[in-house]
Amino acid sequence: MSKKKILYLNLSTNEKDISLGFSNSWLSKFADKFESVDLISLNISSNNQTEFKNVNIFGISEPEKLSRIDKYLKLKNLVKDLTQKNDYSICFSHMSPLLSIIANWYNKNKKTISILWYTHPMPKELIKKIVLFISLFFNNQIVTASESSFPYFSKKVNVIGHAIDYDAFLNKKTNISNNNFVILSRISKSKNLELSIDSFLKSKFNQDSITVIGDAVTDADMEYKAFLAEKYKTKNNVIFKGMIPHKELPDILRSYSYHINSTPPGFYDKSVLETLAAGIYNFYLNADYDKHFDPKALKYTKFSSKQNTLTDLLNSVYELNNNKILEIVSFAQNSVSKESIETISDRVLSTVEN
C-alpha cells in the first residue's frame, strides 16, 4: 500500500478542547507514516498552520460562524476539490462518521481505502444513530478501542486498543505516599460521577480527598455541574478542579494515588489507561479493563453498579498493605503500554494492509 498521501478527517485541532485535546498527537503519528497529509477538521485552531511540516490543514476555523448547511457545503466542496487534485491511498476519519460519509460520497478516487475510528456508546439522538449505521457501508474498516466501544456488530469492526501518551504519563511508584483520590472525567451524567463520589464519602477513605479533573461540554452538562456543586458544597474534601490542559496532566496526576471510573460498558475511557500509566490504582465498572489486571486482582479493582458495591471494594482496599497495592498497579501499568500512541498508526493501518 502506498503511503504517499492520506486524507485525514477529525473534529478538532484545538489542544484546549475538553474532549479532543489529544487529537493532534494522533495526527502527528500519521504524519510520520505518510509523505503528505491533507487534514479536514471541523474546528481548526489558529496556531496549527505551522505545527506540522507535511500537513496541509483545511476546514472550518474557530472564528467562523457558519450554519449547518454552510458547513456541509464547505466540507463537500473541500472534499471534491482535494480528491480531484490528489490521489489518496487512505481516508482516515477520527471520531466523525458524518465526515467519513461526506468524504467517501464526494471522493472522485474510488480506490481510496476508508477507515473510521469510533469509540463511544450508542448515540442518543436518532439522526446520529442513523449516520453511524450508514458509515458502516461507506468505510472499508472500522477501528475501535474495546469490545464494547462500537455499538453495532459488523465484520468490519476491529478492536485495536486505545492510544495514550504512555511515556509522558509513565510514573513508576515505589510507595503510596497519600490517599488522595482523583476522577479524571468530563462532567456528564453518563459518567456516573455521583456513584463514585458518594461511594467514596461512605467508605473508610472519607477523611481523605477526592478531586474531579474535567469540565462540562454541553448545556446539559453545565446544568449537571451546577447540581453537583450544590450537592457537595458542604463537603470540603470533594474538589472540582476544572479542566487541565492535556499536556499538564502527567505532572498533576503525581499528586494522586487512586482513581475511580464508574462509566458503564461502551465507554473505554483513556482516563483509566492514563492514570494506570501514571502509577495510580484504579477502581472501575466496565469489564473491558479486566485485560489490564491479573485475574486474581479483579476482586480488588472491579465493582458493579449495585448499591454499596464500590464502597465495599474501597473498604477492602483500605485494608490492603502497600506492597499488594503496588503489585497490582505495576502489573496494570506494564499492560497498558500496549495501548501507546506510538503504535496507533501501525495498528490502524494494519487492518487494511495485505
Annotated model-derived regions:
Residues 1-46, 201-202, 341-345, 353:
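N-terminal subdomain of nucleotide-sugar transferases
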Residues 31, 114-143, 150-153:
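A conserved, positively charged/aromatic
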Residues 263-264:
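Aromatic "clamp/platform" in nucleotide-sugar-dependent glycosyltransferases that forms part
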Residues 304-309, 319-353:
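A charged, aromatic-enriched C-terminal amphipathic alpha-helix characteristic of glycosyltransferases
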